[in-house]
Amino acid sequence: MKKQRNLRSMAAQAIEQVVEQGQSLSNILPPLQQKVSDKDKALLQELCFGVLRTLSQLDWLINKLMARPMTGKQRTVHYLIMVGLYQLLYTRIPPHAALAETVEGAVAIKRPQLKGLINGVLRQFQRQQDELLAEFNASDARYLHPSWLLKRLQKAYPEQWQSIVEANNQRPPMWLRVNRTHHSRDSWLALLDEAGMKGFPHADYPDAVQLETPAPVHALPGFEEGWVTVQDASAQGCMTWLAPQNGEHILDLCAAPGGKTTHILEVAPEAQVLAVDIDEQRLSRVYDNLKRLGMKATVKQGDGRYPSQWCGEQQFDRILLDAPCSATGVIRRHPDIKWLRRDRDIPELAQLQSEILDAIWSHLKSGGTLVYATCSMLPEENSLQIKAFLQRTADAELCETGTPEQPGKQNLPGAEEGDGFFYAKLIKK
């Protein structure tokens, strides 16, 4: 039996690591969840994700409720108060229980002398809640995005930025990809129905199913057998443009964690696939995904800017480049992105994308297809990136996705329930 731990203090420490140390929640959270019961795993995740989703609101409230911010060794208490405020604002946890557990969290982080302070701040919020929220809802902080990102979205999407921000602040739906080598989508939906769950097919992507209510993967029919994979609908859209065929040599570049690698092999089981990623640790997930689905691909660690180091002079029929990007299209799925990214990251990412595109183009066969994809919402990484590439690359031609003036197809977050995503299909003349 797992030792009872104070979830509020665990959440506060995890959030502090994200915000103060720039660590990714997807790296921090899983080891913490191993320390708690199955029942508590979900609550710990809700507290971490929820606080990061609403961080600017909680920060704003603390600044109103406290004369001085908590600094230095007391900084964890700042995040513990955030966890308390989040519970009072957004969860069904009875207020007395939320307060008691949060105050007790001070003991777990070895700050028992601050129990009274935490209790006082949270009770003051309860008394002033209506007037504080009215003031907050009239401020720019209500958008729950850092100002640099808000400005970029307003500039890029003058008519749509508010709906983008709103979608980013929602909980994401759970999308699945049915493995067509095992089941048709309809036959798997029937199995899902028999298991007492409901799912809905995507109108455009033939393998995509949205669950009515998110569920643990082990509850899904045939998950362990490889019948189904968790993957957002927009990410599945890459296959529409790549259209892999049996017998082709296909490169999946920046492939980890392997969702698109395995999708290529579901669509074209006899394709020869090379999956490459710069991050050796994340490549272990590519191997895991291939193993669960019973598939074979060549997997290599390598830098996309220097392809000759890992593929020599090899030429490919098709290349999928899921480029490293700001991930500003998947904020609803990874709310820590809002606080991990900086404005200065964008030109650096655009430069890296440009270098990878130029380097890999020479490894595409004449007549071959390259699909450039990102989960970004920013033109510098998307349409402007492809426009510049087309201008400097004489043998590149845009195909089916946009126009030379406005190249690519941009999915907005929440549109047809998918994530924000960009695709450009290029043909080598």
From Swiss-Prot:
InterPro entries named among the record's database cross-references: MeTrfase_RsmB-F_NOP2_cat, MeTrfase_RsmB-F_NOP2_dom, NusB-like_sf, NusB_RsmB_TIM44, RCMT, rRNA_ssu_MeTfrase_B, rRNA_ssu_MeTfrase_B_ent, RsmB-like_ferredoxin
Keyword Transferase found: yes
SUPFAM superfamilies to which the protein is assigned, alphabetical: NusB-like, S-adenosyl-L-methionine-dependent methyltransferases
Annotated positions binding S-adenosyl-L-methionine: C254, A255, A256, P257, G258, G259, K260, D277, D303, D322
CDD domains: AdoMet_MTases, Methyltransferase_Sun
Localisation: Cytoplasm
Active site annotation, chain numbering: C375 (nucleophile)
Family matches, as Gene3D superfamilies: Helix hairpin bin, NusB-like, Sun protein, domain 3, Vaccinia Virus protein VP39
Biological process (GO), any one: regulation of DNA-templated transcription
EC number: 2.1.1.176
Any Gene Ontology CC annotation: cytosol
Family as reported in the entry's similarity comment: Belongs to the class I-like SAM-binding methyltransferase superfamily. RsmB/NOP family.
GO molecular-function term, one example from the UniProt record: RNA binding
Alphabetical keyword list: Cytoplasm, Methyltransferase, RNA-binding, rRNA processing, S-adenosyl-L-methionine, Transferase
Protein name: Ribosomal RNA small subunit methyltransferase B
Root EC class: transferase
Catalytic activity: cytidine(967) in 16S rRNA + S-adenosyl-L-methionine = 5-methylcytidine(967) in 16S rRNA + S-adenosyl-L-homocysteine + H(+)
PANTHER family tied to this protein: NOL1_NOP2_SUN FAMILY PROTEIN _ ANTITERMINATION NUSB DOMAIN-CONTAINING PROTEIN (PTHR22807:SF61), NOP2 YEAST -RELATED NOL1/NOP2/FMU SUN DOMAIN-CONTAINING (PTHR22807)
Transferase in keyword set: yes
A UniProt-annotated Pfam family: Methyltr_RsmB-F
Role of this protein: Specifically methylates the cytosine at position 967 (m5C967) of 16S rRNA.
